[in-house]
């Protein structure tokens, strides 16, 4: 019963084996990096683009501009106190509670 069992490979040996076995994705990535070396650089763009990005975007389109303008206008306007303090829905109106209708100036075609 003294069969030799394979020893587990050390971490260094496993790392070397992984480096030798290249996945198809890694091979394709290496091929593309060789073909397009400038794409591997960090995105930065031109100085103009960098300055615009630092400033921050004010408005995307005229709709954003108008919404921001309306929001600023709403903040500046004072809120008016409501004239009516009456709360609707407290009671069920009856014919006696309702105000009288004003007579119409135009005669109805239905009244004959």
Curated annotation (Swiss-Prot):
GO biological process: cell division; G2/M transition of mitotic cell cycle; mitotic cell cycle; positive regulation of gluconeogenesis
Phosphoserine: residues bearing it: 62, 104
This protein's record includes keyword Cell cycle: yes
Subunit relationships: Interacts (when phosphorylated at Ser-62) with PPP2R2D.
Record bears the keyword Mitochondrion: no
Membership in a protein family: Belongs to the endosulfine family.
Biased composition (Basic and acidic residues): 12-32
Keywords assigned: Acetylation, Cell cycle, Cell division, Cytoplasm, Mitosis, Phosphoprotein, Protein phosphatase inhibitor
Coiled-coil ranges per UniProt: none
Biased composition (Low complexity): 1-11
One example GO MF annotation: phosphatase inhibitor activity
Location (main, coarse): cytoplasm
Compartment(s) of residence: Cytoplasm
GO cellular component: cytoplasm
Protein name per UniProt: cAMP-regulated phosphoprotein 19
Region of interest (Disordered), ranges: 1-48, 73-112
InterPro entries, sorted: Endosulphine (IPR006760)
Residue numbers carrying N-acetylserine: 2
PTM annotation: Phosphorylation at Ser-62 by MASTL/GWL during mitosis is essential for interaction with PPP2R2D (PR55-delta) and subsequent inactivation of PP2A.
Function summary: Protein phosphatase inhibitor that specifically inhibits protein phosphatase 2A (PP2A) during mitosis. Inhibition of PP2A is enhanced when ARPP19 is phosphorylated. When phosphorylated at Ser-62 during mitosis, specifically interacts with PPP2R2D (PR55-delta) and inhibits its activity, leading to inactivation of PP2A, an essential condition to keep cyclin-B1-CDK1 activity high during M phase.
């Amino acid at each position: 019963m003294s069969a030799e069992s394979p020893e587990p490979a050390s971490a260094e040996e496993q790392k070397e084996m992984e480096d030798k076995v290249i996945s198809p994705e890694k091979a394709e990535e290496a091929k593309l990096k060789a073909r397009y070396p400038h794409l591997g650089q960090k995105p930065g763009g031109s100085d103009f683009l960098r300055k615009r990005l630092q400033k921050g975007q004010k408005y995307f389109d005229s709709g954003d501009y108008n919404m921001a303008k309306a929001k600023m206008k709403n903040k500046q306007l004072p809120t008016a106190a409501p004239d009516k303090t009456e709360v609707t829905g407290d009671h069920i109106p009856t014919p006696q509670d309702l105000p009288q209708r004003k007579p119409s100036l135009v005669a109805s075609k239905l009244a004959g």
